[in-house]
């Protein structure tokens, strides 16, 4: 396996730091810390360069808060924009291509060019093979991010990274808290890399033709229910021995067409695909909010709110839901604000 060296100097180059700031500030240009860096970028870029070059960088303290994510309360860890979040982007600018090449095709969490809807297309394609996809094993890992073992994660990173200076920086970030903190830009990649050996073992050693993973949510499709039950035992053993992880006890083996595969925000059946109930509910709530308060909302928020759900619905069989809620009034609101502000009307382009 090829190991990469001489990466660290690329990470702390001023050109890379400038690119990292450009990427990290997207959607955040009104934040006070971003404005601070924007006011004198070269000053702050040079500070980061010195921190990295002289190895004086120390991970900042986290701001920890609770957020409700799809009905689950999660502890979210937030770092300051300067220097931490810029430094995370500095690292990823250089190592992302190296890490992504090690991942299987059917993992979809937070990877460029492999979003949720890439996974949706792959699952739909798999379900065309009806005989081999009669049953589904669905499972996830118990407290995945908090349970990631630092020593194991470091060994995984060392398999691809030879550069001792870069490993020092990665270790500084990894050891800043227990497990891997949800909210860090690097964390989503650490999570993917941590489970990558499981992915390859399932695909290559266990010959799982239809295996899909999003973060720690996993789906395997097969023609034999008993085969999937045995596979679940093998996976639990692999996770325990190799990664010091446990499967949640809520794993399920079920017929695909009886219940549908609840995955990636959809419910998949052989002949059709539905939006997950929670997604449909949020869409309805958003449309009601727009109708009630559209005069006080920013036009961009109204249009992006409608079009983001259209992006979800175009992959599902939910035409009646769309045309019930994207009605004459919503089309009129979109047309009114676009004519008033002299901007194009994406809702009109899609719905007429």
Name each model-derived stretch.
Residues 51, 106, 121-215, 219-235, ...:
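Conserved polymerase palm-domain catalytic core
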Residues 89, 229-230, 247-352:
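Right-hand nucleic-acid polymerase module
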Residues 236-245:
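A common structural junction motif
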């Amino acid at each position: 396996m090829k190991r990469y060296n001489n990466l660290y100097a690329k990470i702390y180059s001023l050109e890379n730091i400038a690119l990292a700031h450009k990427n990290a500030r997207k959607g955040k240009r009104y934040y006070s810390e971003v404005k601070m860096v924007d006011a004198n970028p070269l000053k702050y870029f040079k500070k980061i360069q010195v921190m990295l070059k002289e190895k004086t960088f120390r991970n900042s303290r986290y701001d920890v808060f609770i957020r409700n994510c799809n009905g689950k309360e999660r502890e979210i860890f937030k770092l300051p924009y300067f220097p931490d979040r810029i430094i995370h982007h500095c690292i990823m600018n250089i190592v992302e291509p190296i890490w992504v090449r090690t991942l299987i095709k059917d993992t979809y969490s937070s990877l460029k060019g492999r979003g949720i809807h890439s996974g949706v297309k792959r699952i739909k394609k798999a379900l065309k093979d009806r005989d081999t996809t009669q049953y589904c094993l669905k499972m996830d890992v118990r407290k995945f991010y908090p349970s990631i073992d630092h020593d194991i994660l470091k060994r995984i990173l060392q398999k691809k990274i030879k550069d001792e200076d870069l490993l020092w920086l990665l270790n500084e970030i990894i050891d800043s808290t227990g497990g891997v903190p949800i909210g860090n830009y690097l964390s989503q990649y650490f999570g993917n890399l941590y489970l990558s050996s499981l992915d390859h073992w399932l695909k290559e050693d266990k010959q799982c033709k239809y295996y899909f993973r999003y973060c720690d949510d996993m789906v395997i499709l097969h023609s034999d229910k008993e085969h999937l039950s045995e596979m679940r035992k093998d996976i639990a053993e692999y996770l325990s021995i190799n990664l010091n992880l446990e499967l949640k006890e809520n794993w399920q083996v079920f017929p695909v067409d009886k219940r549908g595969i609840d995955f990636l925000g959809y419910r998949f059946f052989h002949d059709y695909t539905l939006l997950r109930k929670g997604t449909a509910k949020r869409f309805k709530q958003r449309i009601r909010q727009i109708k009630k308060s559209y005069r006080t909302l920013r036009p961009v928020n109204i249009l992006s709110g409608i079009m983001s759900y259209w992006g979800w619905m175009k992959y599902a069989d939910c035409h009646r839901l769309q045309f019930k809620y994207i009605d004459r009034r919503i089309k009129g609101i979109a047309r009114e604000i676009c004519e008033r502000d002299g901007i194009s009307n994406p809702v009109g382009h899609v719905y007429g």
